[in-house]
Amino acid sequence: MKDGFLKAAAFSPALRVADCTYNAQQVLAQLQAAAQRGVKLAVFPEFCLTGYTCGDLFLQRTLQQGALDALEWLLAQTRALDTVVLVGLPLLVHGKLYNCAAVLCRGQLLGIVPKTYLPNYGEFYEKRQFTPGSTEVQTVTVCGQQVPFGTSLLFRCRQMPSFVLGVELCEDLWSALPPSTFHALAGATVIANLSASDETVGKAEYRRALVANQSARLLCGYLYASAGHGESTTDMVFAGHDLIAEDGSILAETAPFAGDHAETELDCQRMEAERARNTSFEHTAEGYITVEFDLSPEETVLTRRIDPAPFVPGDPQRRAARCELILKMQADGLAKRLEHAHAKTAVIGISGGLDSCLALLVAVRAMKQLHRSAADVLAVTMPCFGTTKRTRSNAEILCGELGVSFQEIRIADTVRSHFADIGQDETVLDVTFENGQARVRTLELMDLANRTGGLVVGTGDLSELALGWATYNGDHMSMYGVNAGVPKTLVRYLVQYEAETAATAALHDVLLDILDTPVSPELLPAKDGEIAQITEDLVGPYELHDFYLYYVLRCGFGPAKIYRLAKAAFAGRAEYTDAVLYKWLRNFYWRFFAQQFKRSCLPDGPKVGSVTLSPRGDWRMPSDACATLWLAELEQLKLGEQ
């Protein structure tokens, strides 16, 4: 449960219709095994103590009492289990029969939640036996315990307040206004659905989409436990399709008829963080009763996959579609700005590296969208002390293949003159030596844009902005930054996508060579004609920094949790030892805080994903904020591992 992780499971035990004793034994067997695995929330299907397909037998007092006896037996047997358990049964309350979910924990009955929407169409006739539940909460006596009964119930863990459980049953989710919507608005971060959804052609896909979409709409974790083998097959079959979703993603799922269970860890902290940033998600708890319970705060072993590249879809088809969409977004943003400014040219500094390559590809797309010639893009290469033959050649070939206008401006003499003006020794390879070149390049581009009636297109990406890896008022500045919302790990895939769809073999080849070129600002003199300044040797691997960036900005997690996630995500990568992960995480926080002043005055640029650093939009941070708390948490983490 540390860091907000909750190990949860949805079960579909094999049962016997109307055999409550047998069914309770099946539930307990799965519960005991789950408890050994550290499961803290276990959800079983609708009517799992009786079977869903009892029909008019539900009206028999013998079956009703059998279900209560089974529940009482389960309460006694689970006294020592550190798990919240949900089971389904019929319950007679004040002369009316309800389809209910009972919530158990450590031998205590926490509450009873009746079903709100009773299906009475097609193969379902629940209104024949049952009464819809009411939002009004009342107290009833069940198994000798006084418990709350009603749909407006929430269950909160004292040891992990971010774990707040809401309950609904089967048809409730399929209705136009599910009770889970109100549960989430009242504070529930996890929804449990006890279901008996029969299987028909196409229903599994619909069910999967329904669960995923509801978890996305409610910013919650969603467990769906459905009836399976053992239900009567007189008119229907039940496949035991169990699902666990979180914020729109299916984390765990059983194949229909597999006879297994779904199990994973839900991140309750993340749900809390998502809701904190979403101001349209109002907290409305009026009329709700919250029941608190205790669980041992043990550390949860993570089995869920932690994606090491959260900005990049793993599936090739999805990735290709994502790349095309992003390129269109970038191009449309630039096209609008060129059109509005009546710009005659789009001026881009081309280095032969990844970022300027992507910006050039976007600019060509923008001109095509405006029905203008690619020649209206003016690509400028400005070789100086650190430029290598490889990058210079690639820049020229790329421009030729794209059909853009090309100009070379050798800036070495201009830089030397500038150094003479300020008294900089050319042999001293310090920050002034590096930044002086970057600022001269920006000066050339800005004035060239003025002369040609154009706009300077910025090339810096999101990862560089996060780390401050840009010269203030140098490559940091432009008139429109097309890459400002694109992290470095995604830049690579965008260029690769353009290579795979290239119109000519020469364009394909040069794009692949650019991809193969080490990332470098080329501000220090080359050694034997090769790049001497490798960015990732200086600031760290971009795949690590993009991982950290995602969880810092998208989720608001602290250093300790991000470090834990990184260890899980990069497990098996020999180059990423714990010490390496820690080193670059600390570096990330130090640079992120220290370099905010550069982000406070960013040029305009399009947002393309959920993480961005625009000071006018998603990220508003003072330039002089202190990183002390974050670095102190990292220091404590280091001490704890020693």
Regions picked out by a protein language model, each given a short descriptive name:
Residues 23, 161-163, 219-220, 232, ...:
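ATP/NTP-dependent adenylation/nucleotidyl-transfer catalytic domains that generate, transfer
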